A protein has these predicted regions:
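Conserved helix-adjacent loop modules within structured domains
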Residues: 130, 155-170
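Conserved aromatic-histidine-acidic binding/catalytic patches
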Residues: 51-55, 59, 153, 157, ...
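Amphipathic interaction/junction segments at domain boundaries or subunit interfaces
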Residues: 59-65, 69-156
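Short alpha-helical "patches" and their helix-cap loops
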Residues: 30-34, 75-88, 182-187
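C-terminal structured interaction module
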Residues: 163-209
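A generic structural signal for short
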Residues: 7, 157-158, 208
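N-terminal, charged low-complexity regulatory/assembly segments
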Residues: 1-69
């Protein structure tokens, strides 16, 4: 895929957070350089997904693959480094926003259009999604029938790493003060990924604080 300005910005966004965590944990500066070099190679090989709404998730995946080829640590250890780096980043918290911004009803028309466009399957590695309006049990749902993270990991010969990107979804939901319920993912062998997002109850808010 082309190393566009958006791709570079997303890479730097993740790299800045992870570099701080690597330094905190005593890694040499050479590790960050190795990640950078490896990530460039992955991007050169990666299939295009156009102006996908989930480009950030695609680059999160490419970055995580690069980490696993550079740090000498296990996938679990790299996941923890990545997770903790993002959680410690004030910029990351600011960029992803909060529950009210995420669940703003004004965003629904755009989401429905995204869903319709995704089913055209213009790009092999892009996500294909159905958007589910809220019900009595959740506020917003997604059913993903194709996962770009799984596709990229498969292309790179490391399908086992996709499950760690799935785990990051819970981290993002927690940062936004939302509850995510999911019964299966494509990475785990399910036919689709069923995301159900909800606002936290008063009791859950108290527990979180």
């Amino acid at each position: 895929m082309k190393n566009t300005l958006n791709v570079k910005m997303l890479y730097q966004f993740y790299h800045h957070a992870v570099k701080a965590e690597l330094k905190k944990n005593g890694f040499s500066a050479d590790i960050a350089k190795k990640i950078n070099a490896e990530h460039r190679k992955i991007i050169e090989r990666a299939k295009e997904i156009g102006k996908s709404k989930l480009l950030s998730s695609y680059i999160m995946t490419s970055y995580f693959i690069a980490m696993n080829r550079s740090t000498g640590k296990s996938a679990e250890e790299n996941y923890i480094l990545f997770r903790d780096g993002l959680c410690a980043s004030k910029l990351f918290h600011k960029v992803i926003g909060d529950v009210e911004q995420y669940l703003d009803p004004k965003k629904m028309p755009g989401r429905l259009q995204w869903s319709a466009d995704s089913h055209k399957r213009k790009y092999e590695n892009d996500w294909v999604v159905d958007i589910l309006p809220g019900t009595e049990t959740y506020d917003l749902g997604y059913d993903y029938h194709v996962c770009g993270a799984c596709k990229l990991c498969q292309d790179e010969g490391c399908p086992e790493l996709a499950a760690y990107i799935c785990r990051m979804d819970y981290v993002l939901a927690e940062i936004m003060h939302m509850k995510l319920v999911r019964t299966g993912t494509i990475a785990e062998g399910a036919p689709y990924c069923d995301f159900r997002y909800s606002r936290l109850s008063d009791a859950e808010h108290r527990k979180e604080s």
